[in-house]
């Protein structure tokens, strides 16, 4: 069986977020790099660094926390893996769901690369739904 890198990213971020860790390390692949770039662009992650130890590369993510009078609270509300290696889920651009009326994002793998639901609707292309973030 192959490894599900998207599920690994989601689980690592969710676990670090629940434990109030400031940074998390994930293995480097092209899919993880493109997914993390989307998270950085959308404001869910504060910083990303590529790090190399001996022959292995990985990304170090700095999670973003907001401050209020009662202390810090998390930016991620929920992350959910949709399409799995055993059950692929595809949508055309008209059927891509809107998460919380557009407040959340859907990350898609399309023929033009990994992108958000808004970008896919603008370019009028569909693809495999990787995950929901809201």
Curated annotation (Swiss-Prot):
GO cellular component, one term: ribonucleoprotein complex
Compartmental location: Plastid, Chloroplast
Principal subcellular localization: plastid
Stored PROSITE patterns: RIBOSOMAL_S8
Name of one Pfam family that matches: Ribosomal_S8
Domain of life of the native organism: Eukaryota
Keywords, ordered alphabetically: Chloroplast, Plastid, Ribonucleoprotein, Ribosomal protein, RNA-binding, rRNA-binding
Subunit structure: Part of the 30S ribosomal subunit.
PANTHER family recorded: 40S RIBOSOMAL PROTEIN S15A
Protein name: Small ribosomal subunit protein uS8c
Organism: Lotus japonicus
